[in-house]
């Protein structure tokens, strides 16, 4: 029977700005990263569910955890990027032996970054309230321009594949590397989706500004 993985990319109520080479946000590039992870997991035979992108903030956290618990997922995987000036990758989990063993598998495969650490947390909603083990990644620091450039120029794909390797080992599945053509297609698809998300955000901003302009014009008449 296929193992079940629930995916939860960043879903902040107000997306966090980044120093990425193109206009981006934490929610945007974490979803692009999770597109790659999701596709690869399905290729390898996992059952996958993913948090609804239309929901953000506490509503997203609560609905995702409830959905994963009701589905009886085998593992809950979160992907965020960090801020505050560091330069490392981090996997967080509940402070118990089983969770730490799984987080250390992430540590084993996290080779594309200079530094990675495992940290226990008891205060994060998704770690605290999931019925299954939760692995909560802070992939890199999005307030570091150099690391942002790396992530958007091949680093995203490397991190995603290392995550897939770790999840295969944790859940006892056979890992198979993607062929080169598929990897390039994944990379291009992720970039297209990121640009589409940016375009949607710009359209919303334009609509808001247009409404304000029309309101101001009406007041002058």
Language model regions located:
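Active-site histidine-acidic residue metal-binding/catalytic motifs
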Residues: 1-63, 71
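Active-site-adjacent mobile loop/cap segments within catalytic or ligand-binding domains
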Residues: 6-9, 14-17, 69-71, 75-82, ...
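A short, glycine/acidic-enriched catalytic loop
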Residues: 14-25, 82-109
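Soluble non-cytosolic domains of exported or imported proteins
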Residues: 24-32, 58-62, 97-100, 150-158, ...
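Long, well-ordered alpha-helical scaffolding segments within enzyme catalytic domains
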Residues: 32-43, 98-114, 148-177
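Catalytic cores of processing enzymes, dominated by hydrolases/peptidases
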Residues: 95-141, 205
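Acidic, low-complexity intrinsically disordered segments
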Residues: 173-197
């Amino acid at each position: 029977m296929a193992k079940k993985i629930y995916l939860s990319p960043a879903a902040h109520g107000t997306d966090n700005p980044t120093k990425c080479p193109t206009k981006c946000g934490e929610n945007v590039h974490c979803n692009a990263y999770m597109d790659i992870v999701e596709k690869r997991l399905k290729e390898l035979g996992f059952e996958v569910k993913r948090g609804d992108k239309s929901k953000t903030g506490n509503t997203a956290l609560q609905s995702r955890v409830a959905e994963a618990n009701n589905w009886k997922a085998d593992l809950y995987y979160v992907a965020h990027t960090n801020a505050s000036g560091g330069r490392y990758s981090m996997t967080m989990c509940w402070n118990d032996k089983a969770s730490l063993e799984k987080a250390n598998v992430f540590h084993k495969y996290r080779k594309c970054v200079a530094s990675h650490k495992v940290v226990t947390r008891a205060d994060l909603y998704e770690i605290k309230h999931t019925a299954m083990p939760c692995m909560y990644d802070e992939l890199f620091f999005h307030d570091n321009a150099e690391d942002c450039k790396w992530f958007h120029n091949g680093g995203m794909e490397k991190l995603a594949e290392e995550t897939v390797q770790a999840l295969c080992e944790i859940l006892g599945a056979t890992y198979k590397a993607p062929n080169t053509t598929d990897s390039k297609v994944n990379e291009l698809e992720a970039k297209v989706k990121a640009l589409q998300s940016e375009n949607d955000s710009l359209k919303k901003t334009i609509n808001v500004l247009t409404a304000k302009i029309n309101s101001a014009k009406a007041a002058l008449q």
